[in-house]
Design a protein with these regions (language model features):
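Canonical alpha-helical transmembrane segments of integral membrane proteins
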Residues: 40-51, 75-87
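Membrane-helix boundary/interface segments in integral membrane proteins
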Residues: 28, 45-72
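Cytosolic juxtamembrane helix at the C-terminal end of the final transmembrane segment
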Residues: 121-147
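Interfacial non-cytosolic loop connecting adjacent transmembrane helices
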Residues: 16-32, 83-110
Length: 147
């Protein structure tokens, strides 16, 4: 699987030597942009989960479609967060020259992973509870639609 990701990175022209990170200022800039991208990835994942939940149709009779929505909601959250972490680990970490800076960035990458995971699940749960309570997105919690 790792060879496939490296092949994709080569195809889209991402090189390990692009923009080497050698100074503390460059590292702080990279960390700040990583935090911003983590928030953006979280927002995009919530939007994709909303779209996917609206694509799954209601079922007649004993409606169990909320289970499909819940499974996709969890899959989208895990794929978005782990994908973001793997991308940073394969693309940004090799650009950092100093080993100490690499450890500092790895810690930032781990915190951003938790930000995406916790932010995705917490914000989407709040949206389900308060804004989309009777919609398909809110049915992920197991609530039935009004009949």
């Amino acid at each position: 699987m790792l060879w496939f990701i490296q092949y994709i990175l080569r195809v889209i022209k991402i090189d390990k030597n692009m923009g080497q990170i050698a100074t503390l200022i460059q590292l702080h800039d990279l960390q700040n942009s990583t935090w911003i991208y983590a928030v953006v990835v979280c927002a995009i994942a919530i939007f994709v989960a909303y779209l996917v939940s609206n694509m799954i149709a209601w079922q007649g009779g004993n409606d169990r479609s909320y289970i499909k929505r819940r499974v996709w909601w969890v899959i989208i959250g895990l794929v978005a967060s782990i994908g973001f972490w793997v991308y940073n680990d394969l693309v940004n970490v090799p650009r950092i020259i100093n080993i100490g800076f690499r450890h500092m960035y790895s810690q930032t990458n781990l915190f951003c992973l938790f930000l995406v995971l916790i932010g995705y699940f917490l914000i989407s749960l709040l949206l389900m509870l308060f804004l989309f309570r009777k919609a398909k997105f809110g049915s992920i919690l197991g609530k039935q639609r009004n009949k």
